[in-house]
Structures are given as structure tokens and as C-alpha cells.
Amino acid sequence: MPFEAVIGLEVHVQLNTKTKIFCSCSTSFGETPNSNTCPVCLGLPGALPVLNKEVVKKAIQLGTAIEAHINQYSIFARKNYFYPDLPKAYQISQFEVPIVSDGKLEIDTKEGAKIVRIERAHMEEDAGKNIHEGSYSLVDLNRACTPLLEIVSKPDMKNSEEAIAYLKKLHAIVRFIGISDANMQEGNFRCDANVSIRPKGDEKLYTRVEIKNLNSFRFIAKAIEYEIERQSVAWENGRYNEEVVQETRLFDTAKGITLSMRNKEESADYRYFKDPDLYPVFIDEKLLKEAQKINELPGAKKIRYMKDFNLKEDDANLLVSDPLLAEYFESMLNLGVKAKTSVTWLCVELLGRLKAEVTLENCGISAHALGALAKRIDEGKISGKSAKDVLDRLLEEQGGDVDTLIEQMGLSQVNDTEAIVKVIEEVLKNNADKVLEYKSGKDKLFGFFVGQAMKNLKGANPSVVNAILKEKLD
């Protein structure tokens, strides 16, 4: 029996505010455990939360980017549950009236463009972090009270490819509009996947399973694919009702399987109620208009790149996958580098040289340095082959001045036409017999003349050498 998957995603985006959502503690990552804490984020009696206005602004920006409705009145609620990393025994979140609702994202699929509806996005605080070591566990509350936006999609995705396309689009958006670093390794962008299956053509929604805390696109895809397979096999073996229950599962990255964690709670289990310590959020027109001024979105940027610079779709997609890539590209254009040259030296030459532990951000080569190198190629002052040697040196030395390196490495091309003509005439004079052979039909000798000229010139613009040689020989 053919099945189709029904997939909905809950994405937790950690906002890049300097301080936490309800207190003035720092949100910096990697600090000494429990050093960025105060009575509010420790949940001590009598401590009262105060909402960080920047969190509201960033929520509005996200809502604008996903074409959603911004609720100018929203409320905070307490989500009650007990866990060691939740010192208050409740999480401050939004339930009945979220700040953002009814959004959408358009994704590219094999069948063409598809709209994924977004039910809501709400503000909430993050929990702390449990660290399990051997037979005991530690709790680090530095992350407690860090601001999150939880973005909840409708169950509109049918396979792992669509889910990853949606996540990558959302991941790019939150970085381009500047509301989150979205560093998945640091937990800034985490995903819970709700997965169920049904016979193709059936509109009924069957038992869904939630897979928690997935923080890499590769593992998200693998977890979804495994869960679809597990549920399909259970159905075909007549054990669907026994083996597929509403529960929360974890993905074992080493074994590539999902494992049962606990029964999935319903909203009633959390006993949501309005938080009495926080006023409702009222957004006036001034704040709304101010926050709705967002950076150019990756989709619009992609269209502009293809239209204005005649880029291929694959190249444009790569450039808008990362704000820093787009920034480098535009900086190179501003230096006068041709679009095609910029793409080649940024996306092929530089990215192709970066190793797993080295990123564009920490490679040491600035957009200005890469642009200067690419511009020297456009100007004919250095050959593409020589430029690769300069790029290798820049990476090795974590930066440097391009023109100084070209000079030190003796890679400048001769562009002086008179000097090139003089050398070519000398080459032809010294090889008069081969000139006669060439003129009698041995066209392959042209490469010999080019090689001799380039050797004597010790670096010259090949296109200029070729043009002058052709003129002299023909």
C-alpha cells in the first residue's frame, strides 16, 4: 500500500539580543556554567520578570518576513511542567494569543513551488541545559530565560526533502533579517518534527509522533525518513496501533534510529494560564512600523542577482544561503569586480579551499582582499593561475595585502604592449624556420610561439600575447 507522510515542524529560534527576555543577564554563549544568572532566571521567590522590548521588535520582524498577521495585543502564559533545567517549574510562553499568526513560506520542491503555512510564532523563554556525565547530571542555567521564537508550521510537508527546504529557507530568513545567529551547533536553531503517515489519497490525520531537539539538517532528514519507514512497516505488518502511539521520541545519531522518550503531552497537561506577573503586550503603530522595516529577504535578493547580474539559479541560491556570502559578493561588486569573476573566486576558489573547521567568517580573508585579487584578474594584472597561488598564500597567512603579495611573489603580468611586441618579434626572429612551417599549415606551432614569448616575458597577459602573435603571424 502506498503511503504519504504528514509533517509539521516546530522551530525554536534563539534571538540575538544582548540580554535575556525577562532580565538583564547576558545571553553570551560558552560562559562559565551558571555565571549568567540572577534571581529572575533562577526562579527565586519574589523575583519579577520585565519584558525585553527588543524581543518584541524581532518577533515583529519575523512576522513581516513570513507575511504573517502581527497581533498588536498578545499575552504571556505559564506552561507548567517539572524538569531539572526549569527552575520555576513553569516556562513563560504564549498560548492563546501569540504575537504572530497565519504566516507562510514558499519553498522550492521537485514538483515546483509550494506554500507551507505557518500557524503561529510566539515569544518564550528557553530552559537551562542538563549535562549528563556518567552516573550523575549537572544543570547549567546560563541558557534559562534566553529569548526564543517558536515557529509552528501547519502539517503541509510530505517528505524529508520538503521539510529541509522549509527549514533552510527559514534558517536563511532569520539570519538575513538579523534576528538570530541561527548557529545550529550552539542550539540557536532547533527543530521538533511531528511525523505521521496515511494511505495516499486519505485525508484523515493519524497518530503523530514528535521527534525532539534536532539540530542539524542532515539528522533532521534522517530522523524523518526513519520515522516514516518505521510507521509504514508497522502499518503493513498489522501492528500500527500497538507500535505507533502519540509520544515524544529522540533520534539516536549513532544508530540512525528514533527511540521512545516519553508519552506526548497534550496542551491540557501543561495547565496553561495567563502569567499574572506580566502585562499584556500592546504594540502601538509607531513600534509596528519601525520594526517592520526589515533587510532584503533572500528570495528577493536571489531574483535581483539573477536579473541584474545574469547569475545562474544555482549560483544565486548559494549566495543567498548565507548573509556573509551575499555580503562578500556585494562588496566585491562595489570594488568594481565583474559579477561572474566574483562568483568564481568567492563560491568556487575560496569556498573550495575552506576545510571543515574553517569558515568564511574565520578564514582571515576579508571581502576587500578577495575583491582586490579578483579585480587584478579583471584588469589583466595577474593571471587566474597565479591568482590561485596568491589566494593560497592569503589563506596560509590569514590575510595580507594583495598587491604586496603579487609583487613579492613576482606574479605581475606584463601589459605593456610595446614590451610584449619587442619580445614576440625577437622570438619570431630566432625561430624563422618554425615561422615558415607555421605559415605552410602547421597551426599547432602557434602554442610553441606563445610558450616562448611567455617564458621570455616572465609573466604577461596571455590574451594580449595571443592577439599580438596572431597579428604578426597572419
From Swiss-Prot:
In short, the EC number is 6.3.5.-
Q: Which gene encodes it?
A: gatB
GO molecular function of the protein, one example?
asparaginyl-tRNA synthase (glutamine-hydrolyzing) activity
Its biological purpose: Allows the formation of correctly charged Asn-tRNA(Asn) or Gln-tRNA(Gln) through the transamidation of misacylated Asp-tRNA(Asn) or Glu-tRNA(Gln) in organisms which lack either or both of asparaginyl-tRNA or glutaminyl-tRNA synthetases. The reaction takes place in the presence of glutamine and ATP through an activated phospho-Asp-tRNA(Asn) or phospho-Glu-tRNA(Gln).
Chemical reaction(s) catalysed: L-glutamyl-tRNA(Gln) + L-glutamine + ATP + H2O = L-glutaminyl-tRNA(Gln) + L-glutamate + ADP + phosphate + H(+); L-aspartyl-tRNA(Asn) + L-glutamine + ATP + H2O = L-asparaginyl-tRNA(Asn) + L-glutamate + ADP + phosphate + 2 H(+)
Q: Name the source's superkingdom.
A: Bacteria
Q: What is the name attached to this protein's record?
A: Aspartyl/glutamyl-tRNA(Asn/Gln) amidotransferase subunit B
One of the GO biological process terms: glutaminyl-tRNAGln biosynthesis via transamidation
To which protein family does this belong? Belongs to the GatB/GatE family. GatB subfamily.
Q: Which InterPro entries match?
A: Asn/Gln-tRNA_amidoTrfase_suB/E (IPR017959), Asn/Gln-tRNA_Trfase_suB/E_cat (IPR006075), Asn/Gln_amidotransferase (IPR018027), Asn/Gln_tRNA_amidoTrase-B-like (IPR003789), GatB (IPR004413), GatB_C_1 (IPR042114), GatB_Yqey_C_2 (IPR023168), Gln-tRNA_amidoTrfase_suB_CS (IPR017958)
**Keywords annotated in UniProt:** ATP-binding, Ligase, Nucleotide-binding, Protein biosynthesis
Work out whether the entry's keyword set contains Hydrolase. Answer: no
Q: How does it associate, per the subunit comment?
A: Heterotrimer of A, B and C subunits.
Q: What organism is recorded for this protein?
A: Helicobacter pylori (strain J99 / ATCC 700824)
